[in-house]
């Protein structure tokens, strides 16, 4: 992740050279099988295709749909209500998997199948992220995954204690925006705070600091 010094993750008006380059360079060192983000973060990549209404046809079973299981990398979206309008089934060659709840419409499932977009069900009305990770490993062989936001998705993984390592590129920016998403946002009165063990600190170009932690057992 790429937060400001005060933990904000929306890069609006951040005048720091090389942020994207440093992010991509450090992310590549993990050799991950794919990356996972929330619906809002994925919207710029998805497209604006129309979801056609089916006039006839049997109900679409609420079963996982695997369009491709041998991709070299995967782009995964958490999209509980089925709002992303995919133009194609990959992002720069990375096969798209979308994670849904069973409440999505038959029209949307038929649309995803027509586009060749794989989908998994993470629950009936809410996403169980632990269940999703098990399915990703079983159906696609995904063992290492980059969790890349936004704050609510990060928070759901934190609350479920599913983050093995935390890699943070701290930008030399004090953002100060009120109401801006932070690195972890959890909608719960009970804090899911986790203890971490520092692995390394590295100064990168442009005043960026790369912090790496692992969870403390």
Regions found by a protein language model. Name each.
Residues 1-217:
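Enzymes that bind and transform nitrogen-containing heteroaromatic metabolites
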């Amino acid at each position: 992740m790429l937060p400001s010094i005060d933990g904000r993750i929306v890069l609006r008006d951040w005048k720091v050279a090389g942020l994207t380059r440093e992010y991509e360079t450090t992310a590549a060192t993990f050799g991950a099988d794919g990356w996972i983000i929330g619906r809002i973060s994925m919207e710029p990549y998805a497209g604006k295709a129309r979801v056609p209404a089916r006039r006839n046809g049997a109900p679409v079973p609420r079963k996982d749909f695997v369009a491709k299981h041998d991709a070299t990398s995967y782009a995964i979206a958490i999209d509980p209500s089925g709002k992303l309008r995919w133009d194609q089934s990959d992002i720069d060659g990375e096969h798209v998997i979308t994670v849904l709840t069973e409440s999505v419409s038959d029209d949307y499932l038929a649309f995803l199948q027509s586009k060749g977009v794989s989908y998994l069900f993470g629950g009936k009305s809410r996403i169980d992220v632990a269940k999703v990770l098990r399915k990703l490993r079983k159906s696609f062989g995904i063992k290492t995954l980059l969790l890349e936001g936004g704050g609510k998705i990060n928070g759901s993984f934190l609350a479920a204690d599913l983050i093995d390592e935390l890699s943070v590129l701290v930008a030399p920016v004090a953002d100060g925006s009120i109401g801006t998403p932070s690195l972890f946002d959890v909608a719960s009165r009970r804090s899911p705070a986790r203890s971490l063990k520092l692995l390394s600190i590295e100064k990168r170009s442009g005043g960026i600091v790369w912090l790496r932690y692992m969870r403390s057992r």
